[in-house]
Structure formats: C-alpha cells, structure tokens
Amino acid sequence: MARAINSAYRSFINSSATDDRRTRMNAPRSLSALSTTANPALSTLVEQVCALIAPNWPLDRMIAVSPYWKRIDKPFAQAAAELKQLAASPMTMTLSDYHLRWQNKQIQSADLQQAIAEQNSDLSESTLIAALQQPTAPSHPWPLLCDTVDSRRDLEHHPAWNDAITHQISQFCAAYFDHHQADWSPDQQTGLFATWREAMIHDRSITLLLNETSVKQKATKLPEDAMAAIEQTLAQLAIAPAQQETYLQAVLMRISGWASWCAYLAWQAGFEGRHDEHLRDLLAIRLCWENLLDDGERGMGSVWLQWQQSWAPRQSCEEDRALRIALLWQRSAEIAYQRQLFAALTSAQESAPQSSYPEVQAAFCIDVRSEVIRRHLEAQSPHIQTLGFAGFFGLPIRYQLLGTEASRPQLPGLLAPSLIVSDSTGNEDQDAKLALRRRARLKRHFSWRAFHHLPASTFTLVETTGLAYLTKLLKRTLSYPALSASVERFAFTEHEWQSVKPQFTRDPQTLAQRAQMAANILRALGIATEQARLVLLVGHGSQTQNNPQRAGLDCGACCGQSGEVNARTLAALLNDQAVRQALPEYGISLRDDVHFIAALHNTTTEAMRLFDRHEIPTSHREALEQLDQQLTAASHGARQERAPSLELNHNHQAPPSKDNALSAQQLEQAFLRRAHDWAQTRPEWGLTNNAAFIIAPRQRSKQAKLDGRVFLHEYQPERDPEGQLLTQIMTAPMLVTHWINMQYFASTVDNRRFGSGNKTLHNVVGGNIGLFEGNGGDLRCGLALQSLHDGQGWRHEALRLTVVIDAPRERIEQVMASHRVVEHLVKHEWLYLARFADQGIEIYLQGTWQRITQPSSDSSAR
C-alpha cells in the first residue's frame, strides 16, 4: 500500500502489540503520568487496572468495539472465568439458548463430541445434555462494601446504595463531560475527581434522598488528589496487596459504561501525545464511595467484617463446573456453524466456473451486508466481478465540511488521519462564495434550533408558529424521499451540492505522493494488472430516523460515517489524468478507457446510487445504462432476500401467499417507509449474525450462499509471495472484524453491561457521548436489544469469528509469529483460523493444522 496508508496501518500494528512496547492499544500513554503522591507500586497497579477497560466511541462516531479487547492476552476461557467472578458477566449464551439449538438439531451429537475432544474435557456428552434441563445458579459480582450495607438495608422502603452510587456518579459525569446539551456544567479546571469531591461537599441531594447525613461530612476528609484518595481508601478498608488488583477491577466494573468513555478520552489523548487521567479519577470516585460508606467499625458483627468474610469463597479462579459446561456448549455451537460454512465453501470450490473477463468491477466494503447485494449483482452477468476491501478504501483522511469548522475522521477508529479532504467546485472563488452562503444558512438554522431547546419551547413551538410548523411535521412523518438529507448536504441547495465533490486540500500532498497512494490502493484492491472499463467504488451508509445509534449502522471502517466521501475521493484520484500518467513509475499502467465511478449502497433500503455521472465519458454511456438496470435488479433481489426477516415480503392485509407477494415497486416503497418511520426500532438488522471472515479471491466463495453472515476481503495469494498484504489484512481488517464480532457477541450475552438495553427508553447524554436507558443508571454502551432480538428470539447468534484464509500455512504462521496481538487472538481462542487446502479446509487448533472432514454436503452456511 502507499506510504501514507502503510504508515497508518503501521501505527495500528505497532500499537497492537501486547508486549513491552505498550502504546495506545493496551496502555494509553495518557495513563502513564500518574500522581507522584502515590507509591510507585500502587501507581503501576492502578495503571494496569485502568488499562483493562476498552474504549467506547461517541454516538456520532459509533464504531464496534470489543469490550474484551484488553483481556486477549489471556485465553478466552480464563477471561470468562474472571469476568464471571468480578462482575457476574457471562461470556456464553444461556443454556436455554443452547437447548433450543439442540432441539432444532442445529447442534448435533458430533459437534458436542468434537468440542469435548478439543478441550480434553472429563465431562461427557450425556452430562452436557442433562445440564440443559437443570436450573442455572445465579452469578454474583465480587462483593463491594456497598453490597453488604445494602444486605442490611430495608430495600422495600429505601433505595439501594449500589444503585444510588451509580446514579450519582453517572449524573455527575453526564454534567461534567457535557459540552452540547446542558446549560450548565461543572468547572473542569481542577479535574474529574477534585470536581466530584467539591460537589459532594456541597450537594445535599444524597443526604435528602438516602437519609444519610454523614456522607457530606466524610467527603470533606477525602484527599484532594485522586491517587492519594485511592491509597487512603485501600489502607482504610485493609485491602491486602494480593487482593488489590482484583478489588480495584471489581470497583471499576461497577461503573463500566463511564469507564469506557474515559478510556476513549485516554485513547484520543494518546493519539495526540497528551496525558489523560479521567479513567484514574473515575476509579478513585467509585472507590471513595466505599470509603464514605465505611462506618469504621471492625469488630464482630460489623459491616466490614461481614464484607471481608464474603470474600473467602471467592479467593481464586478455580474451575467452575457450570462455566465449563457453558463453554463446551458455546464451542459446540461454533463447530456446528463451522461445519456448515466449511461444507458450503468446499462445495463452492468444486462447482466454481471459470471466471470470464470482467466488463464491470465493483469494489464493496467487507461488511457482511455487502455479501447479499454482491451475490445478486454477480447473478446479473458472468462479466460482473465484485471485490471486497475495507470501506475506507485505504484513505487515511479527515473530512472537513465546506464553510464550517466541523470535521470528522473517515477511517477506522484504530487509526489517526494524516490527510484532509473537503468539498470543492474546483474553483477557489466559487468555493469561498459557496462557503459564505452556507455559513449564513447554518447561522439562521442554529438560531432557530436554539429556540427549540428553550425549556418552554416544547409547549409553545407549534402554538407560536401555527399551521406552518404543523405542516412541516406532517411532511416529515408522511413523506420518504429516496435519499434523506445528510450532514454533507446540509445547508446546500441541490444544485450547489451537485457542483461540489470531495477533494484533497492543498497540503504537502505532491503528485508523486498521490500517484504512489493510487498505485498501492490498486494493488491492494487486486486490480493492478486487470481492470474493466467501468470500476465501481461502492461505499455504504444507512438511512434511519429518530435513531441516536445511527452511526453504528454506517461504515465502521469510516469511523461510523457513510463511505460516500471515501468512494468519491478515491474515484477522483484514480480518474485524475496527471495521477494516471505518473502510475507507470510505480509499476502500474491503467487501460486508457477505464473509468472509476463512486457509488453508495444504502444498507437499509438496498438502493444503489452512482455519483458524478456527468463525468462519465459518452463512450461508456451504453455500458452505464446496462449497469443501471443490473444494479436495479440486484437491489430488488437483495430486498427480496431480506424482506422475510423484516416481515415485508407480503401484503399484511391478507395471509402470506404467492398471490399477495409485493411487486418490486411495492417492496421498494415498503423498505423506504421503514427507513423513514420515526417509531421503527428495527430499520435494518445491521451486522447481526456475523460469524466469519473470508480472506481469499471471490471465486473461492462465489457459489456459496453465505446469508449475509460473512465478511469478504479480496486476497490473491499468488500476487503476495512475501506476505506483506496478508500481514496488513490480518493486522488491520481482521482485527476490525473481530471487534465487530465481539461487540455483537458481548451485547448478546451480557446486554446489561455491554449492551444498551431497550431502545425505546434511550436518552442521549451530552449531545453525543452515549445513552442512558431511562434517566439514569450507568452510561450504556454497545447495541440495543432491538438490534439483536426480534421480540420472539435472538436474531444474533453469539459465535466467535471464524477466519478462512487462502494462503500457505507458513505465510499465515509468520504473521502470527511476528504480531503478538494476532497470536493471542488465535492461540487464546478469541477467534478461529482456517485455510483453504487442496479443495478442502483445515483449521488451526491447539497449535496444529487439522484437516476438516465433512460428514455432510450441505451447501448453505446458516
């Protein structure tokens, strides 16, 4: 890849190592400058505890994050045992979920036997089956002092301290970090902990709510320094050094949502070379609540002694039989999926026809939602070739909105942008005039919005503006244009928007640098030596209303934004005649008649839009007309495939039958209505049910129906003898797919802690920080239940990612040996690694490659 791209990947790869070179992936530099008032050993311990918290991005940049990311240096089973002990957080589905799959024969006896053999378990198949009928004992988190206090409290008439503490910290953090919604926020000059301490001294709400007068007085005795407060509390509660790490982890897990937000702030600070201590301060705040609840009594019958005694049965992470059973069922479910996936891929290799010379090439994002429409587009003609590539198309860019100071990253959240693009007409004077007009419109709009947010505006807005505003409300409710207004188009007229397109700003980007970037992107796309006359660069975005988590449905590789900017920027770069003339210096010659077209795949409605059509040469118009028809047909096919999961495949006024199936136009309108329905909690299923990642030529999987469960990345092993491209894929896109997979996994198995609960109860916090479920509790991270469950059952099956690569063993093993983060993911079973081998599949288990023997010829991966 180009140096600019390669450096971005390299910065990610270097920061991924879990060895002594700890950087922003595992222990952000921003946590290294701890207070000098604490002893060095405690400072190191606090840093290690804080480093276990994965970051959570804000709503407007919502990308998938694995909440387990900082624990991958331990085996999956060990992490599961620790989280169960610390936070009563499960890392498997429930036994009732496995029971349903067993009854439906999704999990078969052979799957159970294989799981038992892999783990060398002493548990028998009959024991596992019998466990499905037995009640599961509830899990409890590592007890804090507040739990023991609550055990002696009349909770029918008084609120629990545990809940009240979470609520107080959460409300304080919401006000402290809010820069958008609140009319007032606490002073941030003294830091999070010191500001909280000051608030506790003067805030009477806790005293009134909980009828506890001593809290305010005790708060005055807390040290002003966070590390000093941590040290004092550990000493006061007599936490032995051997227990401190576990105890501090348990404390921080009680406020894990805000901890993830603070970890994000530390992550961003690390990118900028700054120090950030918010996460340490948050730990100090939650720990000091234990201090405030301590009555000082230490004798027989005291709260403190009862609390200490409750630790006794929890002193070690010994084998938990119930957990072992659950983990074996989890592995059996994964084996069941792998059995079907591997059969489908083996069958696809046997039936794959010879590829023909492409007339159209279409590069899509690796997103699982692309698999469905790619398959339907390929079905339109044997001369259409589709490719898979990370949706930011290798451009490490930040997008600057014309006429504003607003900008946003358009690349994976793991990376830092190094280039800037902005909208331009190609004429500086016109750009300046356009920016001026846009700023004036924005000023008027936001002055009007300020009125919206006045306290009384809820009651006076319609009365003040009369029928004019009522008409606007009705239009927004009843109309559904094919493309909703986006941030990029906001405050532009349609004519103005059509006159601009994203372009690189004037910076040190020389022609040579742009040409080298273009050459290496073409190589990574796999079209350096062969191009069709028309090459589509297809970004993707979603279309929903009244959805604060909308960014989670957009392109994760573009940091939760639409991929339009990246696709249009790359198309402009590759169509630039000066760049094309310079490409031979980098070993690439494009055919003279190739034209690159930017496109956008609307994943909610399955619509496909082509951009900058006026720039397409007249010599390509006939081919373009044919392509339009093929795209329309592919969109309809994708809608038909998705319709049953959305209950849109029939006229609901009559029983389902062939006679009342919706026409193509009716189906399109049904999808549009759903996209514009303010009350729709499930506009689309996003990446629900993702389960695998294939790194191989499309020909390897083209004949397999993968049901939108598989990420697809183009890789041609014969063109990568040194393994450089495979290294980039396994250390960047593969890790991103792992994050996505684990976000969906965690939100399913533990939605209370790693999901965001009921979407209908969501309230936005701080403009874009995150969500509350209702008006309090911890900050909610991850996916809402409605994104995973249809009201009857789970739409997402929580399975660890299966990665299938078309490459020699030695090349794959070299990547693992060179990059510890990859080695940890594979050898600690956070994902599974397999490879194509001689018309079959082999999988890497317990350090060896094992040939897969297929008992079935089933050709669909369900």
UniProtKB/Swiss-Prot annotation:
Q: What does this protein do?
A: Part of an energy-coupled inorganic carbon pump.
Question: Where would you say this protein principally sits, based on its record?
Answer: membrane
On the tree of life, the source organism's domain of life is Bacteria
The entry's family comment says: Belongs to the inorganic carbon transporter (TC 9.A.2) DabA family.
> What name does UniProt use for this protein?
Probable inorganic carbon transporter subunit DabA
To which species is this protein native? Vibrio cholerae serotype O1 (strain ATCC 39315 / El Tor Inaba N16961)
Q: Which cofactor does it need?
A: Zn(2+)
Membrane topology per record: Peripheral membrane protein
Q: What does the subunit section of this Swiss-Prot or TrEMBL entry state?
A: Forms a complex with DabB.
Location of this chain's protein in the cell = Cell inner membrane
Q: Which PANTHER family match?
A: INORGANIC CARBON TRANSPORTER SUBUNIT DABA-RELATED, UPF0753 PROTEIN AQ_863
Transmembrane spans? none
First and last residue of the signal peptide: none
Residues holding Zn(2+):
365, 367, 540, 555
* GO cellular component terms given for this protein: plasma membrane
GO molecular-function terms, A-Z: zinc ion binding
